[in-house]
């Protein structure tokens, strides 16, 4: 990971933590990351398009997001660093998980787990790790049975 990604991601996280909106920004940045295609990010650094036009595109596309995230994306666009936005958001997530002591896990099973099974698994993992746990569930029909935790 490059220094730009670390610095900008850390700056965004520190601001969010100080202003008590880290949870809200985490939720919104995840949604934004899903929308950012490679083509869109390259458009945001295209020198043949004026900076003001690129920034207006960001304002139009993301007018409903938290002002800190919108301003962050505008700043990155202004500085020609728009392609670093997803990496900066990744750094934000890493710092969030470190600060709030959340462990990420992936549970892969042959069949979808019921809500009750998910709840029991999350409780057991939290008890064993002593931390909050965020589990991503994946179904892999090639598994014969059981579950794999990563």
Kindly give the residue locations of the regions a language model identified:
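Elongated, mostly alpha-helical coiled-coil "stalk/stator" tethers of large membrane protein machines
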Residues: 1-150
């Amino acid at each position: 990971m490059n220094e730009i990604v670390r610095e900008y991601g850390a700056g965004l996280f520190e601001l969010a933590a100080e202003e008590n909106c880290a949870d809200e920004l985490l939720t919104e940045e995840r949604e934004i990351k899903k929308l950012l295609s490679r083509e869109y990010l390259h458009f945001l650094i295209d020198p043949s398009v004026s900076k003001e036009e690129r920034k207006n595109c960001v304002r139009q596309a993301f007018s409903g997001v938290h002002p800190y995230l919108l301003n962050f994306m505008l700043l990155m666009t202004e500085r020609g660093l728009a392609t670093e936005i997803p990496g900066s958001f990744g750094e934000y997530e890493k710092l969030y998980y470190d600060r709030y002591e959340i462990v990420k896990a992936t549970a892969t099973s042959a069949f979808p787990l019921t809500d009750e099974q998910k709840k029991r698994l999350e409780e057991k993992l939290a008890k064993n790790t002593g931390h909050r746990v965020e589990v991503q569930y994946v179904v892999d029909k090639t598994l014969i049975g059981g579950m794999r935790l990563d």
